[in-house]
Amino acid sequence: MKITVSVIKADVGGIGGHTKPSDGLIEAVRHTVKSSGDLLLDYYIGYCGDDVHIVMSHTKGTDNEEIHKLAWDAFEAGTQVAKEEGLYGAGQDLLKDSFSGNVKGMGPGVAELEFEERPNEAFTVFAADKTEPGCFNYPMYRLFVDALSNTGLIVNKSLAEGVRFTIMDVEDGTIADLELWEDKPTLEAALMYPGRYVIAEIHTKEGEPIPVSYTHLTLPTILRV
């Protein structure tokens, strides 16, 4: 069965500046997500700095309107509490007045990964705040390019053959696919500039997704282990 992991984050208020969300704000987000009935298989609410992230597993696929609306409603509930408590930057990442089908382009950051679930499935969510959009460029490079850091690049045939990096230029919005090992110098040159060039996706050469990474100016990152 195909499972989708959706991670959607937003800054809707912080205590004393960009520090952390209040307990009341987190609880408002959690209550909204918990009230979603059987829409989700499971969920987790966390934060990094003053960014609240909602981790959801479901069977609706990526870019699903119901899933994105649930996250939007949860952040609106958190915003209401932030205003009542006088938190800093209440609702600042909600750039639109109403939901319009997908949170992309509306302020929140989104990372989603759809895959066939294995018997023992694991994934990791990387979260960061107040940093470069490409802050995870180097660790991802170490994982999928540097055999000194990951012996799987030697013993796993599909990884040994090289993977495909999708790189986004966040200044002009262009995207390029770079393949290992032929494009290694170009990839390394791009990843030296995390303020402009960002890993958007990594796939095997057969097209199997490995991680889904942050979009421009947003985090988080999902890594399927």
Describe each PLM feature range.
Residues T4-G16:
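Catalytic-site or vestigial catalytic-site microsegments of nucleotide-handling domains
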Residues G13-R30:
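Conserved long alpha-helical elements within nucleotide-processing catalytic cores of c-di-GMP signaling
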Residues R30-G37, I54-L113:
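A broadly used, surface-exposed interaction patch
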Residues G37-C48:
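Short, glycine- and small/hydrophobic-rich beta-strand elements in well-ordered beta-sheets
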Residues G49-H53:
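Short acidic-rich active-site patches of cyclic nucleotide enzymes
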Residues P108-T174:
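Extended alpha-helical scaffolding regions
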Residues E188-P194, V198, I202-Y214:
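Eukaryote-biased recognition of electropositive, low-complexity segments
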Residues T215-T221:
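Conserved small/polar residues in nucleotide/adenosyl-binding loops
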